[in-house]
């Protein structure tokens, strides 16, 4: 049944959006680069992870609490700047925080697989407005995912806000 879901996810992803991704699989000790435009059985899971990362960006715009409850594992840890918070704080910030996200998308994502654990790195670009007016932010992110009970959940995330130039 998982193969059907994966096939549907891959079929709905536009070829031009896949081109911005790079996937890395880890069959042994050293990761091997995999061409994301021609997914193999080995990197199908990487494609699922990239889709989940894109769901995260869309969820920010929609303030989608249900999505984040599914994605964030119990015990999830998030750090940025000078704070580290847990799952409940992140859910609250996304749903009721002061910022309104009008656009959010990922760029240059890479997946590094280690069995049932994966690390996804990339850029998250967010535009919107908040109490101080309009904003355009670019974050460098590192997300750690674990596959449990036939699904991927994020267990840890770190975002670094790149200072405006």
Which role does the model predict for each range below?
Residues 1-15:
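Sec-dependent N-terminal signal peptides
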Residues 16-70, 75-165:
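A beta-strand edge to alpha-helix "cap/lid" segment located at domain peripheries
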